C-alpha cells in the first residue's frame, strides 16, 4: 500500500515541482502512533524556503483532494530534506562528492555495515568513502547496489 501511495503522489507532485523549478528528494507515507503522515521533501540548488513549501503543499493538497488516492486520514507535510539530506539517486551522490556522508549497507563490507566519512568518489557502480580509523584515513569501496541507505552527515569536527 505504502509504495503505491508514494508512486501515485510522486506522479502528482512532479509537474508542480517542475513548474516551480524544484526537485523531489523523497516521499514518506508512515504511521506514527495513531496518525498517518505523508511527507514530501523538496529542494533546489539554492535550497527552499517556507513559501515554496507552502505553494507545493497547497497545489498538491488540491490534487490529492481531487483524486483521493489515500483512503485513511493523514497529515500532509512538505519540507526541505534538512542538513542530513538522503542520497537516493546517482545525481545525489555526484552532488555530495567531497562532503561527509553516512552509508548503511545490506551486508558487511570489510566487517562493517555502517560507514561515515568523506564521499571521495562515485562512478555509478561504486561509492568510495574515506573514513577515519583512530588516527589514519582509510578508503572503503562500496558497490552501489549494496547501499541500503545513504545521507549527508553533519560533522562537528
Swiss-Prot record:
SUPFAM superfamilies: YhbC-like, C-terminal domain, YhbC-like, N-terminal domain. One of its GO terms (cellular component) is cytosol. The keyword Cytoplasm applies. Keywords: Cytoplasm, Ribosome biogenesis. Pfam families: DUF150_C, RimP_N. GO terms for biological process: ribosomal small subunit assembly; translation. InterPro entries: Ribosome_maturation_RimP, RimP_C, RimP_C_sf, RimP_N, RimP_N_sf. It is found in: Cytoplasm. It comes from the Bacteria. Required for maturation of 30S ribosomal subunits. Belongs to the RimP family. HAMAP family: RimP. This is Ribosome maturation factor RimP. It comes from Bacillus licheniformis (strain ATCC 14580 / DSM 13 / JCM 2505 / CCUG 7422 / NBRC 12200 / NCIMB 9375 / NCTC 10341 / NRRL NRS-1264 / Gibson 46).
Amino acid at each position: 500500500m505504502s509504495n503505491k501511495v508514494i508512486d501515485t503522489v510522486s506522479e502528482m507532485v512532479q509537474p508542480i515541482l517542475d513548474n516551480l523549478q524544484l526537485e523531489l528528494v523523497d516521499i514518506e507515507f508512515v504511521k506514527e502512533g495513531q496518525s498517518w503522515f505523508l511527507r514530501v521533501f523538496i529542494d533546489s540548488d539554492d535550497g527552499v524556503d517556507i513559501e515554496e513549501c507552502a505553494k507545493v503543499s497547497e497545489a498538491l493538497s488540491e490534487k490529492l483532494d481531487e483524486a483521493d488516492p489515500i483512503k485513511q486520514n493523514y497529515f500532509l507535510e512538505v519540507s526541505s530534506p534538512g542538513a542530513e539530506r538522503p542520497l537516493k539517486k546517482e545525481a545525489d551522490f555526484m552532488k555530495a562528492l567531497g562532503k561527509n556522508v553516512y552509508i548503511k549497507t545490506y551486508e558487511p563490507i570489510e566487517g562493517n555495515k555502517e560507514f561515515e566519512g568523506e564521499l571521495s568518489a562515485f562512478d555509478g557502480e561504486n561509492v568510495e568513502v574515506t573514513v577515519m580509523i583512530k588516527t589514519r584515513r582509510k578508503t572503503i569501496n562500496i558497490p552501489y547496489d549494496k547501499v541500503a541507505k545513504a545521507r549527508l552527515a553533519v560533522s562537528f569536527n
